[in-house]
């Protein structure tokens, strides 16, 4: 048993939202997930890897949602979608913004790895994601190793 008073607000919010999911909606989501996985498999029939940033924005302080990106862009300017409205903000929506490059492979079941590939102007690490075909973990590790041999960012550490 978990004491609800010890949970962070975003965890409580996620639990409450989960309680409202109907079985029929869950079944529909599973069917959509199956279709999605099929489409991702089709993409990987043409490509060995997909390369992307690991996350969509530079790192920010733990437990804080950045309002400004790189000192210039107000987060509200990214989209007028209601999930970005400050009054309607919830943690799961913000996590989706952060995980927009990683979530697709979490859903599809494809292996992916995040590799260090540089630092922000303020010295925080930036990640590059390399995703592969299902059951291609060995090939993905080999490609990751080759990248790290060419660009040994993994040997650098941010100043703390």
Feature annotation, model-predicted:
Residues 72-99:
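A short acidic, glycine-rich active-site loop
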Residues 1-6, 79-84, 135-149:
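Short, basic, helix/turn surface patches
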Residues 27, 38, 92-97, 101, ...:
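Structural helix-boundary/capping segments
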Residues 1-41, 57, 62-66, 72, ...:
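Short helix-loop capping/hinge segments that flank enzyme active sites or metal/cofactor-binding pockets
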Residues 68-70, 131-132:
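Short, hinge-like loop/turn segments at secondary-structure boundaries
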């Amino acid at each position: 048993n978990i004491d609800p008073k010890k949970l962070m607000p975003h965890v409580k919010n996620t639990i409450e939202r989960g309680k409202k999911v109907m079985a029929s909606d869950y079944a529909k989501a599973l069917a959509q997930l199956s279709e999605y996985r099929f489409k991702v498999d089709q993409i990987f029939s043409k490509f060995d890897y997909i390369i992307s940033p690991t996350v969509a924005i530079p790192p920010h302080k733990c437990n804080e949602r950045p309002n400004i990106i790189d000192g210039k862009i107000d987060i509200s300017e990214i989209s007028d979608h209601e999930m970005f409205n400050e009054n309607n903000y919830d943690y799961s929506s913000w996590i989706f913004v952060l995980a927009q490059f990683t979530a697709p492979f979490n859903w599809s079941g494809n292996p992916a790895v995040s590799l260090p590939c540089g630092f922000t102007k303020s010295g925080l690490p930036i990640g590059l994601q390399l995703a592969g075909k299902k059951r291609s973990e060995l090939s993905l590790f080999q490609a990751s190793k080759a990248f790290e041999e060419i660009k040994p960012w993994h040997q650098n550490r941010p100043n703390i």
